[in-house]
Amino acid sequence: MHILEIPSFFTPYGGEFCLEQAKALKALGHEVRILSCVQLGVTIGLKDYLLLPYHRYEHQRDDVTIYQSFQRGLPKMVHHNVMRWVSIVESMFCDYIKKYGKPDILHAHCAKWAGYVAMQLSKAYGLPYVITEHLSLMSLEEEFGKAPSDAWQIPFLKQAYEQAAMVLPVAEELVEEIACYFGKEYRWQYLSNVIDTDFFHYHKRPSRNGRPFRFCCVADYSYRKGYDVLIPAYKQLHDSGANVELIIAGRGTDTVKFRNLLSEGMTSYGLIDKAAVRELLYESDALVLASRSEVQPLVLLEAMATGIPVIATSCIPQSLRIEGGSTIVPIDDIKGLSLAMGQMIGQDTDSKTISESIRHFASPEAVGMKLAQLFRDIIALR
């Protein structure tokens, strides 16, 4: 099959899940490429806005061809930026098919706006499209306001869902959560994100031998990630006399504002790359995430794949609640989180079993085979 992946956002703003699925499908022998237009924001990263290429180009990442462009977004002009982005992707697709021919299927990551442009391309070229949905309810609320909402974007995205051959939420719970905006009149089935389980493989942790129990957290500095809960929870545990450390990484965690929140035993590194995330996990005894809203956070999968247990809040999906591998606490519960962290210190962990559980449903082989079969079935019905 010839499969074209279209992410709504990509490097330098995340979207690695698109690359991982492309790699999984390519490893099964399919022709897979990524078409990516990234809208840059001057307030998000001025250096990227000014210095990233101004022309379209192809490059390779992990043996996957990416047809890339960057759009300079204009502040406070959301509608203009969206329609310009859609126009650029449509133009890039014209270039793409001149070189590679029409794909058999389009795979959009997030309805906003890759799913919408996939719908437009489907109408123009007679191609089926599938949407994998990653965005959380809280991220939609930040843009549309709480439901019911009359935001102009909603009818466009609702139509993209309804006309898709299939919508693949990365958590079953997401369908009900976002129904307040888009309803449920579309075809869907749950499919996990992919993580590179060969890269994030099991690794035996050294004996503590009196060293501190090391928690880590890999999350950007934002309200949604709950650092205002995690930091005081850790302080309570540390002040009680527990021999613990907390190592933090993520965009914005190296700023003066964030580091002023830290206390004894806490360290933050800012944004780190994939290899550094793995090293941090290998050097840690458990991962903790105090999020207020999530769909399927990849870092939980990555942590458990390496063999460490996780502590997370009740917003994470059932699919990530691995027996023996995850402890769930209420959202915004500082005391509950601190107690769970304390209990984790003395907990026996079957690390290999946790790792194998993740490989079973989130490995490239497992997800790639399910995706490929779904795509074949859709194409056969055209």
Regions found by a protein language model. Give the residues of each.
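Short hydrophobic beta-strand element within catalytic cores of glycosyltransferases
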Residues: 309-312
